[in-house]
From Swiss-Prot:
Family designation: Belongs to the G-protein coupled receptor 2 family.
Its membrane topology: Multi-pass membrane protein
Keywords, in A-Z order: Cell membrane, Disulfide bond, G-protein coupled receptor, Glycoprotein, Membrane, Receptor, Signal, Transducer, Transmembrane, Transmembrane helix
Organism the protein comes from: Homo sapiens (Human)
Protein name (database record): Vasoactive intestinal polypeptide receptor 1
Signal sequence range: 1-30
Protein task: G protein-coupled receptor activated by the neuropeptides vasoactive intestinal peptide (VIP) and pituitary adenylate cyclase-activating polypeptide (ADCYAP1/PACAP). Binds VIP and both PACAP27 and PACAP38 bioactive peptides with the following order of ligand affinity VIP = PACAP27 > PACAP38. Ligand binding causes a conformation change that triggers signaling via guanine nucleotide-binding proteins (G proteins) and modulates the activity of downstream effectors. Activates cAMP-dependent pathway.
GO biological process: adenylate cyclase-activating G protein-coupled receptor signaling pathway; adenylate cyclase-modulating G protein-coupled receptor signaling pathway; cell surface receptor signaling pathway; G protein-coupled receptor signaling pathway; G protein-coupled receptor signaling pathway, coupled to cyclic nucleotide second messenger; positive regulation of cell population proliferation
GO cellular component, one term: plasma membrane
Disulfide pattern: 37-208, 50-72, 63-105, 86-122, 215-285
Location in the cell: Cell membrane
InterPro entries the UniProt entry points to: GPCR_2, GPCR_2-like_7TM, GPCR_2_extracell_dom_sf, GPCR_2_extracellular_dom, GPCR_2_secretin-like, GPCR_2_secretin-like_CS, GPCR_2_VIP_rcpt, GPCR_2_VIP_rcpt_1
Amino acid sequence: MRPPSPLPARWLCVLAGALAWALGPAGGQAARLQEECDYVQMIEVQHKQCLEEAQLENETIGCSKMWDNLTCWPATPRGQVVVLACPLIFKLFSSIQGRNVSRSCTDEGWTHLEPGPYPIACGLDDKAASLDEQQTMFYGSVKTGYTIGYGLSLATLLVATAILSLFRKLHCTRNYIHMHLFISFILRAAAVFIKDLALFDSGESDQCSEGSVGCKAAMVFFQYCVMANFFWLLVEGLYLYTLLAVSFFSERKYFWGYILIGWGVPSTFTMVWTIARIHFEDYGCWDTINSSLWWIIKGPILTSILVNFILFICIIRILLQKLRPPDIRKSDSSPYSRLARSTLLLIPLFGVHYIMFAFFPDNFKPEVKMVFELVVGSFQGFVVAILYCFLNGEVQAELRRKWRRWHLQGVLGWNPKYRHPSGGSNGATCSTQVSMLTRVSPGARRSSSFQAEVSLV
């Protein structure tokens, strides 16, 4: 009887890499990965050698040479027992060395591995196996969580982008920037799904192989979309701060600068990272983050998070000054409630929550960081779409106007030549919204535009 094939060597290496990533310090991850790949290459060489020797052997009475995905068992006469050392791959799993495994050659062929499967026979204890099972369940839950989050965000963002695009009364610089931010969230969600499809569903998560061009292209697209999303969050901060800090400025001129920052800067860093990976680390699917090349991607993102957080503090400070005119009574708490409300509205728009883990080491609370950045972060696009489109007073008024018009056309067959009270010029709605801050803020155009941001509900 031929024994069932054990776990393939590549999957053992993937498990070893996962354990090393979760338990080991960040500085030793590159060395562990190299050691893991050395074992994979050694096992592949042994596999090839075993098959070649098996083809050259003459037929013998007994059990022929066999490869069980980890060990090459020599041809053996019936009735004998072969004892071999545990594969070296288990050095990555267990500190217990010197263990052996054996098989017996019987009339029915090779017996099962003794004293048990490789993990038991070679010292992979129950604690390590239980830890791996818990981590597998945890990673599965995280993947399910961010899949739901990105799916929900993708649906709401597509609708929100369509609304801002189709209604001409909503066309203005502020909403154009919102649309680009929505598109960056859409691309990020799509990139996550494409990356998961390339890495997990196609089975290309092995870091020791060369990796397909399609898988690498998916990772390049993913890195670009993530960085572009962070830079469009930065653009939102820059735009709001400019409205408050600059007396007169050309929105059209600044808008093209925002386009360059939001889409151009990420493309530059992504191209540099791609060229560096091709020349220095062209292995696997380019999904490793344990080398100095990762800073080509991580550095600009951290910079954008830090700058946006500083802008957030400055805007809150200016907003507090605007909400506290000299004639207001100290006992009046309404300005502070408006400030708290405005602050909560700006947090998802600026991505302020990313500052919590941005500058901690990669091995600091990895599970908490993973849940916060992947699961919670996946719902950011959904929250932004709700706050800055569906709960926006301008959008709701325009939707009600369109609904009344469609209703009259459908029920009465009437096609009114409707003209908006604002005079019909594009963008008028964006700069004339009455906000909760109007009573204490100047009526200037740039101030009213900012008020529209912090008083959407």
